[in-house]
């Protein structure tokens, strides 16, 4: 796993190329990622860098978290993330920002999808509806059979049924970085990314190379 950064989704807009082509982009604010801990194979069994972003009131931080942040001499953040490292060294207090990316680079963006609440199978799993007429009574949006009879006598795990939709960890792969604004700590990524405006996003170099 290659090092990435934690950002905040600002929303979507579009930019134009010199030829006048409109490109839809998502604006991601890459707040300074403050290093809270650098893990090594000698001390932790693997190499990784732990970062925090944003701010959090002291009353909302547990004693253990407060001690961890104080040991690193960094302000308490709203979240803590960890990135595996193959090479490179960091120290507690270092900052990582949008400058680790370049225009044209492919990235993977991870976030929490928008919650949709309890939904039926048509909206949740794209099931087709049943007949509107021809003897159908109050079964227009029901899923139908969910299994067999005495054998196996149960509903298999993973059966697509009604339930809570959204609010899941989602990763969109191989999105192109259109522009990097280092002065304003902004990253413009082509296309849409998961989650609502203001949500946390994790941006990493793409795991799968095209071509």
Curated annotation (Swiss-Prot):
GO terms for molecular function: rRNA binding; structural constituent of ribosome. GO terms for cellular component: cytosolic large ribosomal subunit. This is Large ribosomal subunit protein uL3. It comes from the Bacteria. Methylated by PrmB. GO terms for biological process: translation. The keyword Ribosomal protein applies. Belongs to the universal ribosomal protein uL3 family. Pfam families: Ribosomal_L3 (PF00297). SUPFAM superfamilies: Translation proteins. One of the primary rRNA binding proteins, it binds directly near the 3'-end of the 23S rRNA, where it nucleates assembly of the 50S subunit. Transmembrane segments: none annotated. It comes from Pseudomonas syringae pv. syringae (strain B728a).
């Amino acid at each position: 796993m290659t090092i990435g950064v934690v950002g905040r989704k600002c929303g979507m807009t579009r930019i134009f190329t010199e030829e006048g082509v409109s490109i839809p982009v998502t604006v991601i604010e890459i707040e300074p990622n403050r290093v809270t801990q650098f893990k090594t194979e000698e001390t932790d069994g693997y190499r990784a860098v732990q970062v925090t972003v944003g701010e959090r009131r002291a009353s909302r931080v547990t004693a253990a978290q407060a001690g961890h942040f104080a040991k690193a001499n960094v302000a308490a953040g709203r979240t803590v993330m960890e990135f595996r490292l193959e090479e490179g060294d960091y120290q507690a207090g270092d900052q990582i920002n949008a400058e680790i990316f370049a225009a044209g680079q492919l990235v993977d963006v991870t976030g929490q999808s928008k919650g949709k609440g309890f939904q039926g199978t048509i909206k949740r799993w794209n099931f087709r509806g049943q007949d509107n007429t021809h003897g159908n009574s109050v079964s227009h949006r029901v899923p139908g059979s969910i299994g067999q009879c005495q054998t196996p006598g149960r509903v298999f795990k993973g059966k697509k049924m009604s339930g809570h939709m959204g609010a899941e960890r989602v990763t969109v792969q191989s999105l192109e970085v259109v522009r990097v604004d280092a002065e304003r700590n902004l990253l413009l990524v082509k296309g849409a990314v998961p989650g609502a405006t203001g949500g946390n996003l994790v941006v990493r170099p793409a795991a799968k190379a095209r071509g």
